[in-house]
Amino acid sequence: MIIYTDIISGDELLSDAYDLKLVDGVIYEADCDMVKVGGDNIDIGANPSAEDGGDDVEDGTELVNNVVHSFRLQQTAFDKKSFLTYIKGYMKEIKGRLQESNPDEVSVFEKGAQAYVKKVIGSFKDWEFFTGESMDPDGMLVLLNYREDGTTPFVAIWKHGVKAEKI
């Protein structure tokens, strides 16, 4: 398994257990699911109608996003102006690190990142923002949105802002 760790905060943000797709050469997107957690009843796949139960969320359980829950991501809020301030600083930091470690990737990063940020700004109200578990304000924001079907959530992380660790 490969764990993707934020190069600034050291927080684990995603793994290859989720189906990753590279977008614009700079973003990993992964579809998520909403799952039930908590409560004492463990779902073992029994027939709910025969067990006198339904598919409702029981008391003591909570419906959560599996990626957000698994990696203990913390929701945060931005307005457009504060997001742009954050993303400019973050992109500058990643570009500086790339110039030292992999200068050939700088132009790919700049072009792809600019295109993806425009996409986020264009549909800003649809996005949710998360930080890693440490809540480091300089660390990467994990972006969450829904696919065109309106029901499938996905997360997005910056390829150049993570290091892949095989465990």
Swiss-Prot record:
Keywords in alphabetical order: Cytoplasm, Cytoskeleton, Microtubule, Protein biosynthesis
Domain TCTP stretches: 1-167
Disulfide bond residue pairs: none
Signal peptide: none
Gene3D superfamilies: Metal Binding Protein, Guanine Nucleotide Exchange Factor, Chain A
Single GO molecular function: calcium ion binding
GO CC list: cytoplasm; microtubule
Pfam families: TCTP
One record GO biological process: translation
Entry's localization field: Cytoplasm, Cytoskeleton
Listed InterPro entries: Mss4-like_sf (IPR011057), Mss4/transl-control_tumour (IPR011323), TCTP (IPR034737), Translation_control_tumour_CS (IPR018103), Translational_control_tumour_p (IPR018105)
Family under the similarity heading: Belongs to the TCTP family.
Function according to Swiss-Prot or TrEMBL: Involved in protein synthesis. Involved in microtubule stabilization.
The name this protein goes by in its record: Translationally-controlled tumor protein homolog
